[in-house]
Amino acid sequence: MKKLLFAFFALTFIIACSKTEEQKPETTDQQTVTTQEAPKPVVSNRYGVKSGVIFYDAPMGTKQELYFDDYGAKEVSITSIDLGIAKTKSIDIRKDGFSYTYEEGKTEGTKKAWYAPASTDYSKADPKTLERYKVKDLGTEIIAGKDCKKFSAEFGSSPIVSWTWNNILIKSVTKMSGADFVIEATKIQDGSVDSKIFDLPAGVTFKEI
């Protein structure tokens, strides 16, 4: 399951960041200065909807919940896996440019910089990236009652077809080992979200990585 999510979001990140490659420091001195300053990542205006909740079904008994506010500047992703003999729930709180991840019932988690892609609209990527990942615009399609943009791409040996609405993933189909693995929204709720869900949990220590 983690491989599926990695494949989609890695491709999304690469495409979204493709236009900023030329802004990287060209010299070692410039690189050092940038590292020392360590600016906090800025995450804003990622989605075309201010706030909401989306529930997903995924392979291997996996369910996911996405809570977001301030147009995606802060969000919480809860991933629950039920294999019958074992159950796990991981929570990822993303806000203020950082991602805080921990597993339910544990007292330690991790904190790292959150460099979220500003867009999942592949058509906005530069031509070289579009060619490298064989990105194709497949038009639009109604998924879960939403008019979604549809794209196909290839990340490594895993072809991906994705549907997004207001820059939010609604469905993805990843082909791995000849089988289709589907992540799809089952319920979409527009509207306000309880701000408490974005609070860091008491009793959990986050180690920065």
Residue map of PLM features:
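Bacterial lipoprotein signal-peptidase II cleavage site
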Residues: C17-P25
